[in-house]
Amino acid sequence: LRKIPFAVTFGNHDTEADVPTTDVLAFIAKRPYNVTTNAGGGVEGVGNCVLPVRNEKGDATAWNLFLFDSHAYTNDSTLGYYDWIKKSQVDWFVAESNRSAAKNKRNVPALAFFHIPVPEYEYVRLQKNTVGNTSEKVCSPLLNSGLFFAFMQQQNVKATFVGHDHNNDFVGSLAGIKLCYGRKTGFLSYGILEK
């Protein structure tokens, strides 16, 4: 056992099984070295959490890692196919960022992780100033819930990391924030990129 702490974020395929994501998170919570928690308190989604990374001395937060449940599919076809990060999650992010800044007496830099990309990813892909593969259109929600704007306003998120589109593994920038894809994993997933 390598004793490496880990965290998970949920995406659209996690709701396709007969097991609710709340049960999946409860199972994961019992695993050694899991650090995923659940924001609770009316924040929509499962596994939204902020993970502080302490500095070398252990007396202050050096970075915050924000994990968001990007949900799955919308129930209203007039709003597109994919669901979106909800207002309660955006409000939670702002509150947690402000709380961390007050506690640490500075704006703590952060990274954000979620499965389904926000609409700004497609804008970055079309700018052609990316590094990596841009082999498919970004499949993001039709509705823009303002998460990226909140990142810009808070001025703490330095990069976002998503999955979802298996033929993309690019990195681009918008408003000083890196928008990054992780490369697909697993042997049963679609796509042309090498595993």
What does each model-found stretch correspond to?
Residues 2, 64-67, 79-169:
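His/acidic metal-ligating clusters that form di-metal
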Residues 2-105, 156, 187:
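Extended active-site neighborhood of metal-dependent phosphoesterases/phosphodiesterases
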Residues 9, 113-115, 182:
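A cross-family glycoside hydrolase active-site/sugar-binding cleft signature
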Residues 13, 164, 183:
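Residues that line or immediately flank small-molecule/substrate-binding pockets and catalytic motifs
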Residues 18-21, 77-80, 122-126, 173, ...:
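Short, solvent-exposed loop/turn and secondary-structure capping segments
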Residues 24, 126-129, 177:
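Short secondary-structure boundary/capping segments
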Residues 50-55, 59, 147-149, 154, ...:
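Binuclear metal-dependent phosphoesterase catalytic core
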